[in-house]
Amino acid sequence: MKTLVLLSSILGDRSKSKALADHFLARMCEHEPASDITVRDLAAQPVPYFDAETAGALFTPADARSDAQRAIVALSDALIAELQAAERVVFAVPTYNFNLPAQLKSYLDYVARAGITFRYTPEGVPEGLLQGKQVYVLIARGGKALGTPQDSMTPYLKQMLGFLGMQDVTVIAAEGMAMGEFAAAEGLAQAKARIDELLPQLA
């Protein structure tokens, strides 16, 4: 299965969310040796912030775009094509100040394109166009908030992904990463165990 992995931690190999993604991929390859995997590190190669110049480029007719605007649209097109091609998408997401990293938000802004990844019906109802994908959101969090009012990140991600048509979303969280060595090890082990439970069901 064609799998796209999106890393977003600034900590590189010290990242707990990356550790979850690495574990996921290792187990996935055991069950699917012929997996076609693409990894995009949004921290190592960040997507520019979605600013006025970006919006202007996307809303300017193709034949009227400047070279700079064409480059912006080309990046958005490439990110979208990569996402469209994937049958499975794995988001490795650290929690920064109760929310997702800015680099992941920028990515989502670049792939949310009216008429390409979502559209509105004649009745004004939004319809996501990135349908039929398995999505796994692997979260690392310093404290413990999953399923509580303190967790605003998970509902946002589910809403945003659902808006784009990705409704089959499984969330796995390693919590307590900043609550001491024992709590961190326990939280990571529990998340990895949950991945191990799910992997045989992926196909």
Swiss-Prot record:
Family: Belongs to the azoreductase type 1 family.
Assembly and oligomerization: Homodimer.
An MF annotation (GO) of this entry: electron transfer activity
Biological function: Quinone reductase that provides resistance to thiol-specific stress caused by electrophilic quinones.
Named cofactor requirement(s): FMN
InterPro entries the UniProt entry points to: Flavodoxin_fold, Flavoprotein-like_sf, FMN-dep_NADH:Q_OxRdtase_AzoR1, NADH:quinone_OxRdtase_FMN_depd
Enzyme class: oxidoreductase
Record EC number: 1.6.5.-, 1.7.1.17
Residues involved in FMN binding: 9, 15-17
Gene3D superfamilies xref list: 3.40.50.360
Pfam families: Flavodoxin_2 (PF02525)
Signal peptide (from-to): none
This protein's name: FMN-dependent NADH:quinone oxidoreductase
Organism: Bordetella avium (strain 197N)
Gene this chain is encoded by: azoR
Cofactor: how and how many bound: Binds 1 FMN per subunit.
Recorded catalytic activity of this chain's protein: 2 a quinone + NADH + H(+) = 2 a 1,4-benzosemiquinone + NAD(+); N,N-dimethyl-1,4-phenylenediamine + anthranilate + 2 NAD(+) = 2-(4-dimethylaminophenyl)diazenylbenzoate + 2 NADH + 2 H(+)
